[in-house]
């Protein structure tokens, strides 16, 4: 399971780092001597000890002031927390951008009216993007496998656009009511955003569930209490059924598209040459 090398030359250390990088790995290298400088310089993340040589410390990205490698897990976890929280928050903001662009193009192409008032988008943005991402960013987030922003954002954006466009088609051909169109679109979009929150911030712990379900309650409560301020109207029985169907179908579609995109990404990683580093190790052993 493990390979241990003794008396490795600086050139061999550098070659080992390059072999791992050629397979798509992000490589960290630790060292404290002059003979480690080549590998430290080549690595994606170089770590030196405070008691090491000046050459190693000058070339390193990280210098452990206590010369204790046990500090690294805490350092890595803090980095993961920052990166993961930024990535999940960026996913939610990107959903809004992608959804707005796709819906704008559809309304221009089909000559329809944009189905949202500015104040209605303010409610959705506050309850589904601004407040929850701020509160959830305070949480410790130490996941090892980071999701890509696009994989998180695109399924929700596509689902929201599809559901809103379906409501637009029904209202245009059956109801001919702008107020009913706006109301149905706001409810469907807000619900889909909440479903996206569950996907982006999965797995859900108690804190995350409290924030997400709390935002759901605030969103629908605000839609009822501030109905006139938000330019929302009432829905008839047929539109209620349509909204209910879309709300039920949307989370499933988000999950299906997410799994599909992750499968494509996983297959792209499998195409990398898996034997290059193994061949290099065998060469060193000889």
Question: Can you annotate each of these PLM segments?
Answer:
Residues 1-35, 41-44, 86, 108, ...:
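Cytosolic catalytic headpiece
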């Amino acid at each position: 399971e493990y390979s241990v090398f003794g008396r490795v030359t600086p050139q061999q250390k550098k070659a080992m780092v390059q072999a791992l990088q050629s397979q798509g790995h992000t490589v960290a290298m630790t060292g404290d001597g002059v003979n480690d400088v080549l590998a430290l310089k080549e690595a994606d993340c170089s770590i030196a000890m405070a008691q090491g040589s000046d050459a190693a410390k000058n070339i390193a990205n990280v210098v452990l002031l206590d010369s204790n490698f046990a500090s690294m897990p805490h350092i890595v976890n803090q980095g993961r927390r920052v990166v993961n929280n930024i990535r999940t928050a960026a996913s939610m903001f990107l959903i809004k951008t992608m959804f707005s662009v796709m819906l704008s193009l559809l309304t221009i192409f089909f000559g329809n009216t944009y189905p949202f008032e500015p104040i209605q988008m303010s409610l959705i943005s506050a309850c589904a993007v601004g407040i929850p991402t701020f509160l959830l960013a305070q949480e410790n987030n130490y996941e090892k496998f980071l999701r890509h922003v696009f994989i998180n954002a695109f399924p929700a954006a596509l689902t929201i656009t599809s559901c809103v466009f379906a409501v637009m088609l029904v209202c245009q051909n059956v109801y001919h009511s702008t107020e009913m169109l706006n109301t149905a679109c706001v409810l469907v979009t807000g619900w889909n955003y909440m479903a996206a929150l569950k996907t982006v911030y999965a797995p859900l712990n108690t804190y995350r569930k409290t924030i997400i379900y709390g935002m759901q309650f605030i969103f629908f409560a605000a839609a009822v209490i501030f109905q006139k301020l938000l330019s929302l109207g009432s829905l008839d029985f047929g539109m209620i059924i349509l909204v209910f169907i879309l709300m039920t179908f949307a989370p499933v579609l988000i999950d299906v598209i997410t799994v599909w995109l992750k499968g494509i990404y996983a297959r792209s990683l499998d195409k990398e040459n898996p034997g290059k580093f193994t061949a290099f190790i065998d060469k060193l052993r000889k």
